[in-house]
Amino acid sequence: MLKTGGLSPSLCLLSLLLALHSAERSYPPPQRRFEYKLSFKGPRLAVPGAGIPFWSHHGDAIPGLEEVRLVPSMKNRSGAVWSEISVSFPSWEVEMQMRVTGPGRRGALGVAMWYTKDRDQVGSVVEGLASWDGIGIYFDSSSNDVQNGPAIRVLASDGHDLQEQFGDGTVRELGSCLRDFRNRPHPFRARITYWRQRLRVSLSGGLTPNDPEEVCVDVEPLLLAPGGFFGVSAATSTLADDHDVLSFLTFSLRDPGSEEALQPFTEKEQFHLARKLEELKARLALGTREDTILPLNSKAQEEGERFFNLEDTLSRQSQILQALQALSRQMDQAEKQWKQQLGSVVQIRPEGGWNTAKVSTLLYGQRTLIQALQEMREAAAQMASGAQVFYLPVGTKHHFFELDQTLGLLQKDLRDLVKMTAKPPRPSGWLPGFSTCLRTSIFLFFLLIQTVGFFCYMNFRQELDKRLQEYLFTESISLQPALPIPRTIGVLRRQPVSPSMQA
């Protein structure tokens, strides 16, 4: 009997690993296709007054033209954005750029990127989940351990778990790594790739614009069914940071060379398409502009695109220019009136001569006022020139509100100047700083007369009282001549003293 020797287990394991590695390297890179309905980026990230196309924002999220501020630097706030269209392809890749800035070494709760079965299930709270089905990549900046944070964690749930807290060592954490993404000089980039039931999270440091990417988490096998929704959320606690998302780009992945099979049209669809083709040919033959523009407009409405009304913007700018020109003319008139008044005051010169200090004060005040008017004119001219080239998008009412306030202030200042110039002319002998009140010498003269009269009256009153006392005393003596002296003295002691006698 012949015996054959088998391979050792170590050689079998090594050959298996080499086969897997060669098979993995033999796979060509997937073919990417940009999905614009699941993406957003600047510079026209949000439509003024309409939000982000194909996305919805919730909580304290603020869509802008360059970025989406999920949460401002305020305490106990939360916000999120969610895609309105579900993911219809099995494999995908997301490139996200974000910026988290704030004071101190510890940050707020952080940012989370979601792929869940139901949108708005997670909401805008990142520190706890209720019931959700999908995955979440959590950029945690609230770690108490500064040396071991911030951290990036990959979480998963099947929709049957109760509320769990991040960062406490739960079994739902598929992987994590430590990477500081706060207060970077450049936006922090994250690439999340799901391809062949494998989830890979790659990160760039944000120290330079072109930092190389490093793999943070690589999980397989992981089954994610299509039909989910993308979302990004953030929240703050007692510590506050600015959480901004600059771009969120989604790509669908498929094997290279594998094109989607075109299904044959049915007879009903062929008949419908043929009729549409005939209608289009008829419209093109007529060459009417309305018929050719109508399909474009309907298509734009279906795609959710919005066009700006340029005529309305130009009409508003023309009204602003007219108002500024009218203000400039009124300022010219006010300046001319002030110059005329200044010339008339200089020409009038009294006989006694001017007070040099008062005249210089008046002239300095008028020169200051004329200079202020000139500055107002220059400001109005700058506003007019800026309004000719500045673009105001329709729907931003705050620009026009600021312009209305500015025009109102200019009109108020102009009305005050007109009222000052409309005062009646002063007499020719009027001096600057001269008061029309009573002179000091006249006041002192009348005060002296009043004092002299008062003292004369008091002297006359004292003389009258003295004569009256003498008269009463002589009459009392003539009526009682026989009274003895001691008795008379006793009677006088018992009688009350009159006020006139006291005087």
UniProtKB/Swiss-Prot annotation:
GO terms for cellular component: COPII-coated ER to Golgi transport vesicle; endoplasmic reticulum membrane; endoplasmic reticulum-Golgi intermediate compartment; endoplasmic reticulum-Golgi intermediate compartment membrane; Golgi membrane. Coiled coil: none annotated. Pfam families: Lectin_leg-like. PROSITE patterns: L_LECTIN_LIKE. Keywords: Disulfide bond, Lectin, Membrane, Signal, Transmembrane, Transmembrane helix. It is found in: Endoplasmic reticulum-Golgi intermediate compartment membrane. It is a single-pass type I membrane protein. Residues 32-253 form the L-type lectin-like domain. Residues 1-25 form the signal peptide. SUPFAM superfamilies: Concanavalin A-like lectins/glucanases (SSF49899). Residues 26-439 are lumenal. One of its GO terms (biological process) is endoplasmic reticulum to Golgi vesicle-mediated transport. The keyword Hydrolase does not apply. Disulfide bonds join C177-C216. Its main location: endoplasmic reticulum. The chain crosses the membrane at residues 440-460. GO terms for molecular function: D-mannose binding. InterPro entries: ConA-like_dom_sf (IPR013320), Intracellular_Lectin-GPT (IPR051136), Lectin_leg (IPR005052). It comes from the Eukaryota. Residues 461-503 are cytoplasmic. Predominantly expressed in the sublingual salivary gland, in the mucous cells of the acini, but not in the serous cells, nor in the duct system (at protein level). Not detected in the submandilar, nor the parotid glands. Expressed in the mucous glands, but not detected in the serous glands (at protein level). Besides the salivary glands, expressed in the Brunner's glands in the duodenum, but no other mucous or serous glands (at protein level). This is Protein ERGIC-53-like.
